[in-house]
């Protein structure tokens, strides 16, 4: 792998994190509307649970992407060191 590959990978991963944060924000807004317009207490509770579950899912995905960014940064550093030795 080349240094350029890792740079592009980092850009892509950062864009994915931004998209995931935006998706989380939109989901939260959507579920807030569902909760507000729910007609029964049980449906409100169900929407609240779904909102929490979906937010947690987005959080896990964001954390996963952050770990991937860290791994890619480490790989980029190793590749730069290897390039210096050549």
Model-derived regions, located:
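Amphipathic alpha-helical interaction segments
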Residues: 13-14, 39-42, 55, 66
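Long amphipathic alpha-helical coiled-coil segments
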Residues: 2, 6-9, 61-86
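Surface positions of alpha-helical coiled-coils, especially the charged/polar e/g heptad sites
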Residues: 2, 6-9, 36, 43, ...
């Amino acid at each position: 792998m080349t240094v350029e590959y890792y740079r592009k990978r980092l850009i892509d991963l950062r864009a994915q994190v931004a998209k995931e944060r935006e998706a989380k924000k939109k989901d939260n807004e959507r579920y807030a509307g569902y909760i507000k317009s729910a007609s029964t207490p049980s449906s409100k509770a169900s929407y609240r649970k779904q909102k929490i579950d979906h937010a947690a899912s987005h959080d896990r995905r964001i954390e996963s992407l952050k770990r991937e960014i860290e791994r890619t940064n480490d790989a980029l550093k190793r590749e730069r060191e290897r390039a210096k030795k050549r």
